[in-house]
C-alpha cells in the first residue's frame, strides 16, 4: 500500500464501492473454502440496499487509500444488547490482503463506542478469516464463532 490509509465512517455514496469489495472478497477469497452456490447466495444478500441498511443499524467504516475505498468493516450491538457487540462484514480488496488494512479496520472498530461499552464481542467469521482473527487476539467459541472478552 503506497498511499496513506484513512479509515472513516461510511457515507451512502460509498455503497457501490463497499458492495464491490464484499463481492470480490466473497468470490475471490472465501470462494476457496465454500461452494460456489453459497458464495453467490451471500453475494445476492449484499445488495446496495442491504449495505445502506446495515450502515444505519451499525457503525460502518471504510478504509480509503488515495481516493479509492479498499476495505470495510462494521460494528453493531449484538441483538440490541449494550453489553455485547458484533463485528460484521470486514472485507479488504483481495489484492491488498496482507498490507495491514484489515488490522487497521479491526483496530478502528475496537475504538468504537459499541466495542468500548461491550463485555463481549461476537464475530460470525468465515473459515477463511479465522486465522486473521486469532492473530488479532480473538478466540473460538463453540468451534464456530469467534469472541473476545474485555473489561468495560
Language model: regions and residue ranges:
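Short alpha-helical functional segments enriched in proximate histidine and acidic residues
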Residues: 25, 112, 132
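Residues forming the Rossmann-fold NAD(P)(H) cofactor-binding site
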Residues: 99, 103
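Acetyl-CoA-dependent GNAT
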Residues: 5, 9-13, 20-95, 106-108, ...
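Conserved short alpha-helix immediately C-terminal to the canonical SAM/SAH-binding motif I
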Residues: 105, 129-132
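Basic/polar N-terminal segments that are highly enriched at the extreme N-terminus
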Residues: 1-3
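Conserved GNAT acetyl-CoA-binding A-motif
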Residues: 106, 113-126
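Conserved catalytic-core motifs of GNAT/GCN5-like acyltransferases
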Residues: 120-124, 134, 139-152
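Short secondary-structure capping/turn micro-motifs that flank functional sites
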Residues: 71, 129-130, 149-150
Amino acid at each position: 500500500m503506497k498511499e496513506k490509509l484513512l479509515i472513516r465512517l461510511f457515507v451512502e455514496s460509498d455503497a457501490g464501492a463497499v458492495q464491490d469489495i464484499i463481492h470480490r472478497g466473497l468470490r475471490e477469497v472465501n470462494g476457496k473454502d465454500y461452494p460456489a452456490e453459497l458464495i453467490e447466495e451471500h453475494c445476492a444478500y449484499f445488495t446496495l440496499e442491504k449495505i445502506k441498511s446495515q450502515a444505519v443499524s451499525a457503525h460502518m467504516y471504510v478504509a480509503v487509500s488515495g481516493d479509492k475505498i479498499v476495505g470495510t468493516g462494521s460494528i453493531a450491538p449484538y441483538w440490541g444488547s449494550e453489553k455485547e457487540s458484533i463485528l460484521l462484514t470486514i472485507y479488504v480488496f483481495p489484492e491488498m490482503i496482507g498490507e495491514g488494512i484489515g488490522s487497521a479496520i479491526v483496530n478502528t472498530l475496537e475504538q468504537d463506542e459499541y466495542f468500548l461499552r461491550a463485555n463481549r464481542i461476537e464475530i460470525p467469521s468465515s473459515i477463511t478469516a479465522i486465522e486473521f482473527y486469532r492473530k488479532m487476539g480473538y478466540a473460538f467459541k463453540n468451534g464456530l464463532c469467534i469472541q473476545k472478552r474485555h473489561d468495560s
